[in-house]
């Protein structure tokens, strides 16, 4: 049950003070009242207007019940006065908890109250720090405000209007911070200059070498010349190496020509048959089994001996022609051997 803020506490107390105090509806349309006899819990207990009425106190007048709790009404009066205290506006999702406490206890929903001495001290100190103070920097007797709105000491003028502070108080800290920024820039610039100047001094020392270093450099220059000479010699040998390799290749070719090779004849010309010994042996074996190959068998042979299908086909054609020629010659020999010419 929520209570509207614009309704005064006297309007809630009227139905209780009237002879028909048990009526359930208030004259104000925005408020629904329940009698204390229905429930043990108090009417408007959240707002702190009327306490719970036990069955023993039903006979008594409700005015006595209101008088026995003067702290509630006095606290409402203090809240209503904008000059006495300042209350921060909470977001919509977090309504104010209306439970009241004795005046000695401070609530978290109320802005921290600063004394005049602390305000005078915190004013100039706030200008020195651009970031808000953490929670550990707050005073011992000050209660922190919820994290959405942190009461900064620079805006602690609470005894003026409900808008925290005037325009002059807002302008003063910003002007002081702006005046401090150029100081920090001036302080940082000489530091940067000093940092840049440090590496310059070793450079000047390194640029002026000692006589001992000069001697060592001259001594090192001598050995450096020797590698260059060795590189030249290597380049000469590299230039002559192609000639030697060509000569070796020619000699190898001559040796092969004298003995003969499978692909080259003794005279050095290339043989007509491009097949190796292994390939010809495999083809001869297959030719003994079958002179004519099917396409599937031809593909299998070509894969086994690493030849194309066309090469195997041509070889078998040539082999058949060779066999035909041999048969003809043999036939002629047989015929001529039978006849003896006198």
Curated annotation (Swiss-Prot):
Gene Ontology terms: cellular component: nuclear body
Protein name: Homeobox protein Hox-C10
Disulfide bonds: none
Naturally occurring in which organism (per UniProt): Mus musculus
Residues in the DNA-binding region annotation: 268-327
UniProt-recorded Gene Ontology molecular function terms: DNA-binding transcription activator activity, RNA polymerase II-specific; RNA polymerase II transcription regulatory region sequence-specific DNA binding
Crosslink site: Glycyl lysine isopeptide (Lys-Gly) (interchain with G-Cter in SUMO2): 106, 195, 254
Entry's family note: Belongs to the Abd-B homeobox family.
Subcellular compartments: Nucleus
Biased composition (Polar residues): 1-11, 204-219
Phosphoserine PTM sites in chain numbering: 189
GO biological process: anterior/posterior pattern specification; embryonic limb morphogenesis; negative regulation of cold-induced thermogenesis; neuromuscular process; proximal/distal pattern formation; skeletal system development; spinal cord motor neuron cell fate specification
Modified residues (Phosphothreonine): 8
General function of this protein: Sequence-specific transcription factor which is part of a developmental regulatory system that provides cells with specific positional identities on the anterior-posterior axis.
Keywords: Developmental protein, DNA-binding, Homeobox, Isopeptide bond, Nucleus, Phosphoprotein, Transcription, Transcription regulation, Ubl conjugation
Span list, region Disordered: 1-20, 186-271
